[in-house]
């Protein structure tokens, strides 16, 4: 409901209207078959660079920690590189994919927990997956957690300091978190998200020894 109310005052940009007239074909996009019956799911969406060392490491961490506590969870990095278009379209395409995936996940009535992680341009697909799942699954839904790392918050045609994501990311989740650093050059990633718990890692000492991907 929070996301719905927030969106009432949002005026579609010219690029959003243009995208709606010629949306990206996502008809082939499907989730792993194991998600149809899994009781616990972790779904990771990469940024514009595609799957990399960081997404591989994140999946490995999920699996190792789950094994340590005996949690049976389906964990996957979803490769959506073929849908990564120009910066004026990628946010809208990400939301379209997320809406599709959320509805697919809602068909799994055994699902107990859903943890979605999005990096950079993967923010829109991640948030939309959570919101669509919550809307479709209703009262019997699973517990939903969203984790965003250095998320891009604007879609094509939006101002860098006033993007859709700043106002809405995480609105429909049981728990949403934003890992923020404020000193990089990527547009629209340096402002805390309004509806997420924010962890500002800008000054963390560990960054000095962290090799960029």
Please name every model-derived segment.
Residues 1-8:
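Hydrophobic membrane-insertion alpha-helices, especially the h-region
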Residues 24-38:
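Short beta-strand-to-loop junctions in surface cap/lid or active-site-entrance loops
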Residues 39-47:
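Short beta-strand element of the alpha/beta-hydrolase
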